[in-house]
Curated annotation (Swiss-Prot):
HAMAP family: GcvPA. It is an enzyme of class 1 (oxidoreductase). The gene is gcvPA. The glycine cleavage system is composed of four proteins: P, T, L and H. In this organism, the P 'protein' is a heterodimer of two subunits. InterPro entries: GcvPA (IPR023010), GDC-P_N (IPR049315), GDC_P (IPR020581), PyrdxlP-dep_Trfase (IPR015424), PyrdxlP-dep_Trfase_major (IPR015421), PyrdxlP-dep_Trfase_small (IPR015422). This is Probable glycine dehydrogenase (decarboxylating) subunit 1. Transmembrane segments: none annotated.
Amino acid sequence: MVFSPHTADDRARMLQEIGVERLEELFAAIPASYRFPQLDLPPAISEAEIYRELLEWSMQNFSTATTASFLGAGSYNHYVPAVVQQILWRGEFYTAYTPYQPEVSQGTLQAIYEFQSLICLLTGMEVSNASMYDGATALAEGALLCVSPPRGRNKIVVAGTVHPHYRSVLRTYTRGLPVSIVEVPIPETLRLQPNDVAQYLDDATACLVVQYPNFYGRIEDLAGFAERAHAVGARLVVSVYPIALGLLRPPGELGADVVTGEGQCLGIPQSFGGPALGILATRMELVRHLPGRLIGATVDREGKRGFVMVLQTREQHIRREKATSNICTNQGLMALAATVYLSTLGKQGLRKVAELCYHKAHYLAERIADLPAWNVIGDGPFFNEFAVRCPRDPREINAFLLERGIIGGLALGDLVPGQQDLMLLCATELTTREQIDRLVEALREATA
């Protein structure tokens, strides 16, 4: 195809049509100094030189590929099978966007359908949407779909043991809405009991929001929470760590009405904290309140199976006041990564990963508990994270560890008032015994 740019005559006729003589007159409102600013750029270099310079910069970073990491708190260092990245790189999939003529892209729709099916199997729920942005926004959307002002249900009760960032996002979502948020205080045990939340639940409560395992890694009594919430007509919203569900009972079997979660652990690298993947699944009775998109399977006139977008209740497609959310593009590419990851591991593979996380974290806890002046904090079972009380400022300890090539845990005082002496430590299937022993000796040295 031959491209013919505008000729001088074409430009002259266009300028005459809009009533100006010169092109520069169109930009008269912009100060001259800003029209063509002189940028302080270095001299041009070759592609090979650029690559070498960027590589040198990147080598200044601490990578979990070369550094022992005990940092979790929502973003976890799990192994990603090579097949996940290979499939993501395929040109047919390498976009996060859902096509505007979706039925033309049967491969994309089937991948999302499989994602929804896997999430339902994992969580024990009846319906899942096509993904959300991350665990925090998924939790906020999951809580809001329970709110019903016409029924007088406009109060959200949130366990203090839910991730602080998730609670912050929920407060942001509800700002300006006729919704009140009540937070249940964090007990010294770092594990809430059903009786702890009962006094905060009443006829105005839309839902109770908890985490499973909670922010401190402890496993709380979901069935007890569900019983307390349902007794007052409220729903139970549970934010999950998907890998833990390889060992733990699905929240759907324990009475959860809405399940949300962060899917980064399902085949997505940490990558400085993003991109992530939001999981949102509910009981079928709430399907009309689900935000985002929902893919379904059907049969065409010739009897052939096909996939269609059955629900997309967002403001681009229906009246704004009727939309369930203003979420636009979902995390389609990351949902594909999770689909390939779960399909590759299978039920037994996921259980094996969860078992490794569990046993390595408990070995780490046992070793630290033997250190003088160090205490493992919390009550009840935990999965792969736990809090410890440090004999020295956790931030100073982390700086000491980093000098020795170890990424320490999260200094909880940075997120939770009153927990300045606590550190949250994590272990995954990639954590080795040698790394754990090296951390313990470094902690011993740091507080000698």
